[in-house]
Amino acid sequence: MSDYPPPNYPPPNHPQYQQQQDETYHVRPDMERQQDFGYYEKPTPSQNFDDSFKVEKPKFNDWPFAIFFWLVVAGFIAVAGITLNALRSTYGFQGGSIYGSGNTFTLNTNTIILFAFIIVMAFILSAAIIVFARLAPKAFIVTGVILNVVLGIGTAIFYFVEKYYSAAIVFLIFALFGAWCYWSSRHRIPLSATILTIVIDVMKMYPSTLIASFIGLIFSAAFSALFSIVIVATYVKYDPNSNNEACSVGGGSCSKGKLIGVLVFVFFAGYYISEVIRNVIHVVIAGIYGTWYYLANSDQGAPKHPALSSLKRALTYCFGSITFGSLIVSLIQLLRQFISILRSNFAADGNGWGVCGMIILDFFVGFIDWLVRYLNKYAYCYVALYGKSYIKSAKDTFDLIRFKGMDALINDMFINTALNLYSLFVAYLVALLAYLYLKFTKPEYNSGGAFYAPVIAFAFLIAGQINRISLTVIESGTATFFVALAKDPEIFQMTNRNRFDDIFRNYPQVLEKITSDH
């Protein structure tokens, strides 16, 4: 650090960045021209994480949402107990393998085995993607885009040949959109590769990032397995078919209304719990990256065990904030599921105008879903580093978007688009596996093809969710790095001069810093 002199800040009203003879560009500290010179959230060097990232007046933020979450978990466990008991009691009727089920009217053990294949395949592909990203960051971005375009078009062609036109059109749209993203953003890939390389280097320095991601992947896969079985068991327990033996098992009688009501709750709880798992991992990894950015090169050194300290904060003071933001996303996901069901019903009735209306509505709700997820990603970085409530973190995020919005969006377009495309890649393969499985095993409940759409859609959803959680380590590292770079770029300039210069060449706005605090 002695080789790099500290930044010599320009006067507050100086309109240009100053450049000395050593070609060092200095950071403007007063981007917003505010008068609150008392601002300083910068962590202080210490061997203790809580002392470095100090929380003033520690308290359990947003605790009512944490209580609500645990009530949802309790409800899910209760439903799981009732439905799994019905599945166990009628196990011989459902069948114990791929073939030989007496249940010919709804999902059975044939589907459970399919979901097991789906989860294992998604798990293996997710682990392989993390290894690839660590070994070749630039190739990770380029290959991710190209591979998804090729696979998407190939899958669409396959479905066209099979005359499964609805799936073919959906996959073709995804493929064409991926091609457009690559073509329009190819000149920005060097900046993305630089940032991704930095994130991967930190992964190498802190193996706890990978350990946290792997543990999250295990938890997500385990919950996905339980979620999948509970969905099947719910159909088994509450389907009102006269041949359903599970109706006589404890837990209430069968009816269409009960089936729909329980499924709505199960899907909501599944979305909610999955989101909380994902965001807890995000907060833990954000704490590790924050430790590296601010304290790795300090005289005192970085705090010990940042992952455990971040996990402790995520599950105590910050847990209510995590469940708050996750609830918003889960409700939006549930609304999108309702829209999808209505669209399917309109299509079955031949109501073209209804289908068009639902497609338009789904587009707007999908945009809101993307926007909330986008804001949550950065808000949770503030939650992780400063222990703030969800609302205060959201306000800080709005300031970040207000002054760095386009920069953050561009940053996300290149790295996170690649991550999302890898998630789509996994989902493509798993959805194709689900289709082929149903086609070749020919379960009786799908003799008319009525279960192709829901099973394939669920396979696509669950595989994408597992993969997104596994890639949280990269997404969280990128978001945390951008937040820290926006608030304190001079630290990175002093401690990582060459990397900072690489970023500056592609992103001169890095010299502007945000000084607001809520």
Curated annotation (Swiss-Prot):
CC per GO annotation: membrane; plasma membrane
Residue spans crossing the bilayer: 64-84, 112-132, 140-160, 164-184, 211-231, 257-277, 315-335, 352-372, 418-438, 446-466
Keywords assigned by UniProt, alphabetized: Cell membrane, Membrane, Transmembrane, Transmembrane helix, Transport
Any GO MF annotation of the entry: transmembrane transporter activity
Subcellular location: Cell membrane
GO biological process, one term: transmembrane transport
Protein name: Protein PNS1
Organism from which the protein derives: Candida albicans (strain SC5314 / ATCC MYA-2876)
